[in-house]
Amino acid sequence: DPQKPIYFNGKYHYYYLYNRGYPKGNGTEWRHYVSDDLVHWTDEGVAIPKYTNPDGDIWTGSVVVDKENTAGFGKNALVAIVTQPSAKDKKQEQYLWYSTDKGKSFKFYSGNPVMPNPGTDDFRDPKVIWDDQDNKWVMVMAEGSKIGFYESDNLKDWHYTSGFFPEQTGMVECPDLYMMRASDGTNKWVLGASANGKPWGKPNTYAYWTGSFDGKEFKADQTEAQWLDYGFDWYGGVTFEDSKSTDPLEKRYALAWMNNWDYANNTPTMKNGFNGTDSVIREIRLKEQDGTYSLVSQPIEALEQLTVSTDEIEDQDVNGSKTLSITGDTYQLDTDLSWSELKNAGVRLRESEDQKRHIDVGIFAEDGYAYVNRAATNQPDKSNTYVESKAPYDV
C-alpha cells in the first residue's frame, strides 16, 4: 500500500509498505522516498522498521506534519498513526510513531496504542487530516463495511463521532477524506475508499462519494458510489494536495497499488524477483455535469519530461484495420477517434512480431463503454475473469 505523500521542506515524502523478505519472510514496514517532481524518486531507506516492539509489523496508516506541536513532539514534527496487530491477541489497533529528523526515522510513542481495538475484527488504515474550520484533527478508519469518523486535539486522544455505511461496496480499506473545488466553483467534500464492488458488477478499486462534512459526520449527495478507476489494478489508492499550487482545492494527486487481491501473488514480476508496484501519479479534478459531481483524472504533466522523441501521424481513414509504422517499448499515445458505422473502434498496442501478444484499447459504441483488453498478454489472472475492463464514457 502507498501511504499518503506529504510535502515537507521543499520535497514530497512518500512512504509505502515494504517486505524485504518476500516471499520467504513476512511482515511489512515503511520505506521512504523523496521527490521534487513526483516522477523521479530517491530512496531514503526504511523509516519505520518492523518488529522493533512487542506488537506486530507495520501496516497502513498516514503521516502528518504537526505544524503547531499539538502532540508535543516539537513544532513541525512528523507524526504517523499506523495499524499494528497487538502483541496480546493480534487485534488491529492504532499506534503512534513520530519523527524529529525530517522523516528519516520514527520513534515509538510510549503511550501506545492511541486507539485500542473496540471489539471488531476490522479496525485499520487510519487517514488523518487537519480540519481548518474546527481546528482539530479528523480521522477516517476502515471498519469492515463501514467507515468510522474520529476527532482529536493532539493526535493521541481520539473520540468517535460518526459512521458512514456505504452500499454495494463490500469490505472497504484505505479510506480517504478531502475537500475539492468543482468546475462550477462549488466546494465539495469527497469521501473515498478502496472497495470491493465485484459482487454487484462494480470495480474493486477506488470508490468515492461527494457530499458535505460538518466536522463530525459526512452526508453523501447520493448513496451509490462512483469509481475513480474501472481497471483491475488500482487498489489502496491515496490522494494528496498539490502543495505547490496557490489554489490547493483546484486539483489533487493520486496513486495506488497496482495489483488485485485475487491474484496478488501471481504477478508477472515474480520471475524478476519482486512483487508489488505502485502506479504513476495522476492528477484529479472534480467536474460538475448535470448536477452530479465526479472525479476525472489523467497522468501528471511532469511525465512529459521523460519524452525523448515525438512522432505525428496524419489522419487515417480505416475500414477494417490498418497497421501504423510506429514502434517502441514505452510511449504515450494521444489520439482522437471518430466513427460512423463501426460498433468497435480502437487501437492495438505493443503487438509482437508474431501478433500473438498485444493490448487492445477502444470504444464499443453500441453499448456505450470504453475498454482495455489484456487477454493476449502475460496477465496474471489465470481464471480469465480480469481480462477486459470496461468504463462508461461521455459522448
Curated annotation (Swiss-Prot):
Chemical reaction(s) catalysed: Hydrolysis of (2->6)-beta-D-fructofuranan, to remove successive disaccharide residues as levanbiose, i.e. 6-(beta-D-fructofuranosyl)-D-fructose, from the end of the chain
Residue numbers annotated as active site: 1
Encoding gene, per UniProt annotation: levB
E.C. number(s) listed in UniProt: 3.2.1.64
Entry keyword annotation includes Transmembrane: yes
Protein name: Levanbiose-producing levanase
Species per Swiss-Prot/TrEMBL record: Geobacillus stearothermophilus (Bacillus stearothermophilus)
Function of the protein: Catalyzes the degradation of levan mainly into levanbiose (difructose). Can also hydrolyze inulin.
Primary residence: membrane
Temperature dependence: Optimum temperature is 55 degrees Celsius.
Membrane topology field: Single-pass membrane protein
Gene3D superfamilies cross-referenced by the UniProt entry: Exo-inulinase, domain 1, Glycosyl hydrolase domain, family 43
